[in-house]
A protein has these predicted regions:
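ABC ATPase nucleotide-binding domains
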Residues: 268-290, 295-307, 319-320, 324, ...
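Extended non-transmembrane interhelical loops and adjacent amphipathic helices
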Residues: 129-132, 202-203, 300-310
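Short intracellular "coupling" helices and adjacent cytoplasmic loop segments at the cytosolic face
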Residues: 118-121, 286-297, 313-314, 446
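ABC ATP-binding cassette signature C-motif
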Residues: 2-273, 319, 326-552
Length: 552
């Protein structure tokens, strides 16, 4: 049972808010509202202040000006990328513990019910009944009657099944702890969900479940940031853009926002041109007749008019970024062939775990292939076998003639020397190259000017991803094996990588949970299912239709 939500007037109002970090103004005198049941996407360049808005709403940061007001009964749930310490509980207990107030209310209600069975004065009973009614109302509002069932359903939806409910939370890896942290926030059943990159570390199945849950089960308001374009498009009905010191709202999803933003900018540019033409005429008149006494009144009038005109300013546009892979050397027609490939990993308890067996397939020159499958199917392991990062347990694998393979994974970023600069790192990958060639390659992957002197330990996840890709291209690669290349990249950077891969004349095989990326890029799909590989001779849409995953 889900309690009724807040009524229309119970919104979060952000009124004339101002926040700055040092001398840098994030936004000034900005206003917007979060209405009951609304679905908003928060967008803007890195460092614009998106996460700051979340922290201002939760009270983790203070305003420099303005006001944020909301009903005192409003329950806010905030999911961030800062997981915090988790230990000493099972996965289910950890999720339930986040609803401590709800559980406390349940205990209080039971205690009051027991107390009502005891004789007491009428006044005391009346006071107890009033307190009992208030507690019961809040307990119902928080969804207390189905708390444990909800916690289990959310954990299962995020890929942690009943067999892992009682598993110690500290035994989960970082990515799975992120899922538990997300489950905690969803289970709270808040009035307002603030979600900062909720799809990070989720596979496609969990992303689809989360979309469905937010669409059909959760009736509160949602404000989210996400680098997953399709996730954003399917859920939000309003975009709140943070940038250039302002906050601007657009009705519609992310794709609508992109179109509408361009229309508004063109209109602003046209208005700016007209105003500049008018100002030039007025200033010309003033300059020509300023010295003539007969026109003194007119000149003075026009000077005052100009002083009162509010100048139209054109906000600085985000720099359009683009990189492209150099023309690769031509490989043979058959790039890679696997026959009855199998992989078994040893487990800590001394047993063996079969990841996949009987996997066969052929990758041809120029193909863009996606490897898909449920979490744990062996997608990343298959790519590791292809890239020579691990040996298959059995079967044969043949890399074709003149194939130069480049491999990208999240582990690649961990191997970077944190004390070296971007320039030094690329130089290590191509020691015979001139300074100019190295700088050009760095620039192609958006490291320009002083950026090449940044130390690795100061780079963001997205910057590290770009650097590893740049190092791949330091050699004449014609076969790219990419394991989650879009992780840590924002939407704009994903679009840049997408265009570069679409124009890449070589061969690509990749694992990605970004459905927009897959829809736009791949022309063939390998699905690993129950240890076997099924080829689909068509694009991602074709695969979804043939495999019965149309809702993806």
């Amino acid at each position: 049972m889900v309690a009724p939500r807040l009524c229309e007037e119970d919104m979060i109002h952000l009124t004339n808010i101002t926040r700055q970090h040092g001398t840098h103004i994030l936004f000034k005198d900005a206003s917007f509202q979060i209405t009951a049941g609304s679905r908003s996407g928060l967008v803007g360049p890195n460092g614009a202040g998106k996460s700051t808005i979340f922290r201002l709403i939760t009270g983790e940061e203070n305003l420099d000006g303005g006001e944020i007001s909301c009903n005192k009964k409003t329950v806010i749930g905030y999911f961030s990328q800062e997981v915090g310490e988790m230990s000493g509980r099972s996965a289910l207990a950890e999720v339930m513990a986040a609803s401590a107030r709800t559980m406390q209310l349940g205990d209080e209600i039971k205690a009051m019910e027991a107390a009502m069975c005891e004789p007491m004065e009428d006044d005391a009973l009346a006071a107890l009944l009033e307190k009992y009614g208030d507690a019961q109302e809040e307990f119902e509002h928080r969804g207390g009657y189905d708390l444990e069932n909800r916690a289990q359903a959310v954990l299962t939806g995020l890929g942690i099944g009943p067999e892992d409910y009682q598993r110690p939370v500290e035994s989960f890896s970082g990515g799975w702890k992120m899922r538990i942290a997300l489950a905690k926030i969803l289970t709270i059943n808040p009035d307002v969900l603030l979600l900062d990159e909720p799809t990070n570390h989720l596979d496609v199945e969990s992303i689809v479940w989360l979309e469905s849950w937010l669409s059909t089960e959760f009736t509160g308001a949602v404000v989210m940031t996400s680098h997953d374009r399709e996730f954003m498009n399917r859920l939000v009905t309003r975009i709140v853009e943070v940038g250039n010191g302002t906050i601007t709202t657009y009705g519609g999803n992310y794709d609508f926002y992109l179109r509408e933003r361009e229309v508004r900018r063109e209109q602003l540019l046209a208005s700016h041109r007209r105003q500049q033409e008018m100002l030039a005429k007025e200033e010309d008149f003033i300059a020509r007749f300023a010295a003539r006494a007969s026109h003194a009144a007119q000149v003075q009038s026009r000077v005052k008019k100009l002083e009162k005109i509010e100048r139209i300013e054109i906000p600085a546009e985000q720099k359009v970024i683009k990189f492209e892979f150099p023309e690769p050397p031509r490989s043979g027609d058959d790039v890679a062939k696997v026959v009855q490939l199998a992989k078994i990993w040893p487990v800590e308890d001394g047993t063996d775990k079969s990841v996949f067996g009987g996997v066969s397939g052929l990758i041809r020159r120029g193909e863009k292939v996606a490897v898909v499958g449920v979490n744990g199917a062996g997608k990343s392991t298959f790519l590791k076998c292809l890239a020579g990062q691990t040996e298959p347990t059995s079967g044969t694998m043949t890399i074709g003639a003149n194939v130069n393979l480049g491999y990208f994974s999240q582990h690649s970023m961990e191997l970077l020397d944190p004390k070296k600069s971007v320039f030094e790192t690329v130089q290590d990958a191509m020691p015979m190259a001139s300074i100019g060639v190295i700088r050009n390659l760095c620039a192609a992957f958006l490291f320009q000017g002083d950026d090449v002197d940044k130390r690795i330990d100061r780079l963001s996840g997205g910057e590290k991803s770009r650097l590893v890709l740049a190092m791949l291209l330091a050699k004449p690669i014609n076969f790219l094996v990419l394991d989650e290349p879009t992780n840590h990249l924002d939407i704009q950077s994903r679009e840049v990588l997408l265009e570069a891969l679409k124009n890449f004349a070589g061969t690509v095989i990749l694992v990605s949970h970004d459905r927009h990326f897959l829809r736009s890029l791949v022309n063939r799909v390998f699905e690993i299912d129950h240890g076997e590989m099924i080829p689909y001779e068509g694009n991602y849409e074709y695969y979804l239709q043939k495999s019965g995953h149309e809702n993806y």
